[in-house]
Amino acid sequence: IGSTGDVLIDGGPADAGDIIAANITQLGVALSDVKILLHTHEHHDHVGGLARLKQLTGARLFASPLAAQALERGTPNPDDPQYADHHPLPAVRVDRILEGNSTVTLGNLTLKAYATPGHTLGALTWQWQSCEGDDCKTIVYADSLTPVSSDGYKFTDHRDVVAAFNNSLVRVGSLQCDILLSPHPSASGLRDRLLKGSLVDPTACFTFANGLKQQLDARLKKEDNGE
């Protein structure tokens, strides 16, 4: 929520658009105040609702180049590791392509986008600062970066994807990060951290990336062993 409008990241599956809109209204925020729509990764369960939300809010949609292709076509990209398992999604026009590591500014809001391919090749991780009085925290909404795929897909057959994946993990692990969020909450242990009473942990991004690096290495080892 910003001084001149609001930003929404991700839109859930296609049938979630109206639900998300109702929740926004319940918070006392006018739908017309939502000015920009963003995404983490371009799977139907995260971006399927963006078409409806764009219709309801009139917001502009920003996306990475590969995510924009999927959004405007209405189908996942063929080089997606999970291509065979993911559903079509309502096609929607993208208003701005976010090349490389971009910055999105709206009033007093500044969000930094980091290209973090891996879970999908068009995935983005977001970083911004949020303040309550003089108490400011850096928030990172990191893409899940889990090394999962459709049956028959081998990461070891796509070394370029593996290299990009590893670069993404290094990038996320090095980010300044007081509070970590992720589109799949379980990927970043959100429930356990909430039960501990605070989400503030300056080591959260490093710990998150390190755990995912171990998952990726284990997946590659299994593939090398023919499993």
What are these regions (language model features)?
Residues 1, 100-137:
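Core dinuclear metal-dependent hydrolase active-site scaffold
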Residues 9-15, 73-84, 149-160:
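Acidic/histidine-rich helix-loop elements
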Residues 9-11, 34-42, 62-64, 115-118, ...:
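Active-site neighborhood of phospho(di)ester-bond hydrolases with catalytic His/Asp-centered motifs
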Residues 15-16, 26-103, 131, 200, ...:
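Active-site HxH/HxHxD metal-binding segment of metal-dependent hydrolases
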Residues 16, 42-48, 68-71, 121-124, ...:
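Active-site environment of divalent metal-dependent phosphoester hydrolases
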Residues 133-135, 145-227:
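Accessory terminal helices/loops
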